[in-house]
Amino acid sequence: MATIRADEISNIIRERIEQYNREVKIVNTGTVLQVGDGIARIYGLDEVMAGELVEFEEGTIGIALNLESKNVGVVLMGDGLLIQEGSSVKATGRIAQIPVSEAYLGRVINALAKPIDGRGEIYSSESRLIESPAPGIISRRSVYEPLQTGLIAIDAMIPIGRGQRELIIGDRQTGKTAVATDTILNQQGNNVICVYVAIGQKASSVAQVVNALQERGAMEYTIVVAEAADSPATLQYLAPYTGAALAEYFMYRERHTLIIYDDPSKQAQAYRQMSLLLRRPPGREAYPGDVFYLHSRLLERAAKLSSRLGEGSMTALPIVETQSGDVSAYIPTNVISITDGQIFLSADLFNAGIRPAINVGISVSRVGSAAQIKAMKQVAGKLKLELAQFAELEAFAQFSSDLDKATQNQLARGQRLRELLKQSQAKPLTVAEQILTIYTGTNGYLDSFEIAQVRKFLDELRDYVKTRKPQFEEIISSTKIFTEEAQALLKDAIQEQKELFLVQE
């Protein structure tokens, strides 16, 4: 028979007492009062923070947006079909954040930074808050480096700098997304990280953009954040902030980033839906009163950082759709007032075959020539002036039949300059190619050609300079100045190519 040893028992009891961990776990909980339309009303959750994540019994996550005296209004990040009245909810003590890392490059993710491209999990050791404050005044420096889009009309006349916010605005089907994707393609080899945020788009449109980027090798330096039109309003509202958090991760690591929001007016509609369901008072066009703040806090995160912070940058290109050219609607005017300029795309120009359909007259960049290299400044000034004079003359010439020779020549020159601004989609030009194209047009070398021949001649001239006069591109890229030597090389090339072209024709 086993003997009971009192000292052993007392030792065991003593050990257990010493190991006893008096950890008290306080959980902030509540009860679901009602649920529906992506909104839940919760009783309890007394100490919840505004914007805090809450977790429902069946696993759905929500964000506490309305903190009222009797209940808490929560927006759901999912369909919430399994949430029942009376089920419990607990506060997590966390604000919405996402994992961030280099591994996101080349991937398609949703607003919660979960991959949706079927290529497995993305591993990351760091995270960032989805909503983080924009850099302050001391943390910034003025924009001075160009961000080349590869489109002559933009780089010459409406230049965009690294750290700028430039709005792309126009009616549907005028090529807004094409301008943005061409800009992404043109960043190849420029060490710029691109983030494309698709908000409330058709899934087929997003797939088209992703395929176009993959075919041309641009996905290597691009992240696509997509929330399609059938996504919950909460996720459409969060998607742009997720994209901004990813771009900021690279910006604070001394990298240059480009972020495209396509389009913030869909985000505003999702936010309006959430606000109305939460019974917040509606304002103009039924948008809530803080819809301006919705976009300003997003776009202010784009910046050119000071040298103390490493001079990283985040350039934002929001895309806003207008209804039959009306830029005085609520969301367009809001975004115009926040951004540093706008590129206006016109349906009339698009239908007239001028593509990209940029209306140079009413488009503007508030950074201006600070975002251009010296070589571009040398040739672009004349182009702007001549096109402005041509637009004026063309309007006047409609009412007059007999024009003097000088006016006819000016009109002919203007038509050829307009022709040289046309570009095919997904064929961005280098700075050197743009400079030689503009120089050829503004110095009258195209005047002897028929309008239909202009684009063909310019294509052949660019190929000729690339193969026969490679020194031209070397001079422009190394000195950033359109030197006399470069000018002499270009004049020779134009003359030689002109002779070859006339023989072929």
Curated annotation (Swiss-Prot):
The UniProt record lists the keyword Acyltransferase: no
Highest taxon of source: Eukaryota
Coiled-coil residue windows: none
Swiss-Prot/TrEMBL catalytic activity: ATP + H2O + 4 H(+)(in) = ADP + phosphate + 5 H(+)(out)
InterPro entries to which the protein is assigned, alphabetical: ATP_synth_asu-like_sf, ATP_synth_asu_C, ATP_synth_asu_C_sf, ATP_synth_F1_a_nt-bd_dom, ATP_synth_F1_asu, ATPase_a/bsu_AS, ATPase_F1/V1/A1_a/bsu_N, ATPase_F1/V1/A1_a/bsu_N_sf
Chain residues that bind ATP: G170, D171, R172, Q173, T174, G175, K176, T177
Database matches in PROSITE patterns: ATPASE_ALPHA_BETA
Presence of the UniProt keyword Plastid in the record: yes
Assigned keywords, A-Z: ATP synthesis, ATP-binding, CF(1), Chloroplast, Hydrogen ion transport, Ion transport, Membrane, Nucleotide-binding, Plastid, Thylakoid, Translocase, Transport
Site, Required for activity: residue positions: S363
Subcellular location: Plastid, Chloroplast thylakoid membrane
Record note on quaternary structure: F-type ATPases have 2 components, CF(1) - the catalytic core - and CF(0) - the membrane proton channel. CF(1) has five subunits: alpha(3), beta(3), gamma(1), delta(1), epsilon(1). CF(0) has four main subunits: a, b, b' and c.
Protein family (similarity comment): Belongs to the ATPase alpha/beta chains family.
Name of the protein described by the UniProt record: ATP synthase subunit alpha, chloroplastic
Organism of derivation: Oenothera biennis (German evening primrose)
